Amino acid sequence: MGRGKIEIKRIENTTNRQVTFCKRRNGLLKKAYELSVLCDAEVALIVFSSRGRVYEYSNNNIKSTIDRYKKASSDSTNGGSTMEINAQYYQQESAKLRQQIQMLQNSNRHLMGDSLASLTVKELKQLENRLERGITRIRSKKHELLLAEIEYLQKREIELENESVYLRTKIAEVERLQQANMVSTHEFNAIQALVSLNFFQPNMIEGGSAGYPLPDKKVLHLG
């Protein structure tokens, strides 16, 4: 059968209260000592009796232990304040980022021609100027790319013309050699076929017009 639960309340009888205090105090001091020895803990115990007498135990200097406790309590309080300040800072930064995202989304919709009802005449004029500057930059870039493409095609045209002249010269040389009976008819036909093959293969436009021969002279104009 287990022990009954003892009700904890103030002992009214003065003598009994003093006797109980002495017993419990000694037991508490013993437990503090055992805790410090068994667990290598720094323990400080201070007890004031109802009459104002002080009893203490410390396995170290009790003042040093109290100072250490004060420092630990101060660090804990400051740490809590720092965490609170950091939390407020991150909340503010998060709110700023959400506001910036909203502004960018609104600006993007305005550039697409949406959600214009809320804009004033001044804001619409500013939006118009932004779009015009953007179109100007786009046209400038397109013009730059077109000029580069035209320059490439002109260089390619010159290369093909030079190659055409070279191949025609080769054909004329082969014909002359045949007339001089230095090349047989079979060899002449083979050389002419090879030259013709080499002539027509490079004489093609590479950029999306494959299969069509490049004219002898191309005049390119910018619109």
From Swiss-Prot:
This is Agamous-like MADS-box protein AGL11. Residues 1-61 form the MADS-box domain. One of its GO terms (biological process) is positive regulation of transcription by RNA polymerase II. GO terms for molecular function: DNA-binding transcription factor activity; protein dimerization activity; RNA polymerase II transcription regulatory region sequence-specific DNA binding. It comes from Vitis vinifera (Grape). Disulfide bonds: none annotated. It comes from the Eukaryota. PANTHER family: SERUM RESPONSE FACTOR HOMOLOG. The lineage of its organism: Eukaryota, Viridiplantae, Streptophyta, Embryophyta, Tracheophyta. Pfam families: K-box, SRF-TF. Residues 87-177 form the K-box domain.
